[in-house]
From Swiss-Prot:
SMART domains tied to this protein: EFh
Positions of Ca(2+) 3 binding: D133, N135, E137, E144
Name the UniProt record assigns to this protein: Uncharacterized calcium-binding protein C50C3.5
UniProt-listed InterPro entries: Centrin_CML-like (IPR050145), EF-hand-dom_pair (IPR011992), EF_Hand_1_Ca_BS (IPR018247), EF_hand_dom (IPR002048)
GO MF term (any one): calcium ion binding
Binding site for Ca(2+) 2: D96, S98, D100, Q102, E107
Coiled-coil ranges (or none): 31-54
Signal peptide span: none
Keyword Cytoplasm among UniProt keywords: no
Keywords from the named record: Calcium, Coiled coil, Metal-binding, Repeat
EF-hand domain: residues covered: 47-82, 83-118, 120-155, 157-189
Positions contributing to Ca(2+) 1 binding: D60, D62, S64, T66, E71
C-alpha cells in the first residue's frame, strides 16, 4: 500500500516536538475566533484548535489568512521534508476543499483533525486485532469483532456493522475475512 505523499507533511506537523518548536520559534499574536464552535464541529478540545491555529499562523507567512502552495513548500523545507512539486500538490489537493488554490484555517483544521482521528482509529484497530489473535491468517467472526471492538475502541458496533466491515475486508468473496485482510482494508481507509 503506497503511503500518501501528504502524510509525511501532516505527520511531521502533528508531532508534538515539532509543533512546540515551531510555536516557540515564532510568537503568534492573533487569536483564533469561534474556538468553541470549531472545537464542537470538529470534536476536538479548544486547546487543540488553538494549537492548530498557531501552526496555521506560522505557515501563513504573508498574513493573508490562507496558506498557498509556496507557503506549504516553505514549511516542508523547514520540517526537512522533500519539497518536490508532487508532495506540495498532494498537500494542497488533500486540504483545499474549496478548490481556490489556498488553504484557509477551517480547511487546515479539518485536515489536521482528520489525520489525528485516523491515526487514533488505526492504533485502536491494531490493538483490537492483536486481542483477537496474532495469526494473520485467522478468520475473524463478526461476534469476535464486536467483542474485541468494544474492549478497545471508544465506541461499540453492532453485529450487522461488524458483518459489513468483514464483508468489505473480504477480498475473495467468502463472507469472512482474515486478520491480514482486515488490517489491509483498515490501512486503505
Amino acid at each position: 500500500m503506497p503511503v500518501a505523499k501528504d502524510n509525511q507533511f501532516w505527520d511531521a506537523l502533528m508531532e508534538n516536538k515539532v509543533a512546540k518548536k515551531l510555536i516557540k520559534k515564532h510568537k503568534c499574536k492573533a487569536k483564533c475566533e469561534n474556538i468553541d464552535d470549531l472545537a464542537n464541529r470538529y470534536e476536538v478540545s479548544k486547546q487543540e484548535v488553538e494549537k492548530v491555529f498557531k501552526i496555521f499562523q506560522l505557515m501563513d507567512d504573508d498574513g493573508s489568512g490562507t496558506i498557498s502552495s509556496s507557503e506549504v513548500a516553505k514549511m516542508l523545507n523547514e520540517l526537512g521534508i522533500d519539497v518536490s512539486p508532487k508532495v506540495v500538490q498532494a498537500v494542497m489537493r488533500s486540504s483545499d476543499v474549496s478548490g481556490d488554490g489556498q488553504i484557509d484555517f477551517e480547511e487546515f483544521l479539518a485536515a489536521v483533525t482528520s489525520k489525528i482521528k485516523l491515526s487514533t482509529v488505526k492504533a485502536d484497530v491494531q490493538l483490537m486485532l492483536s486481542k483477537i489473535d496474532n495469526n494473520p491468517e485467522k478468520v475473524i467472526s463478526a461476534e469476535e469483532l464486536v467483542v474485541a471492538w468494544s474492549e478497545t475502541v471508544s465506541t461499540n458496533i453492532t453485529v450487522k456493522e461488524a458483518c459489513a466491515l468483514i464483508q468489505q475486508a473480504d477480498t475473495q468473496g467468502r463472507g469472512k475475512a482474515t486478520i491480514h485482510e482486515f488490517i489491509t482494508m483498515c490501512q486503505t481507509v
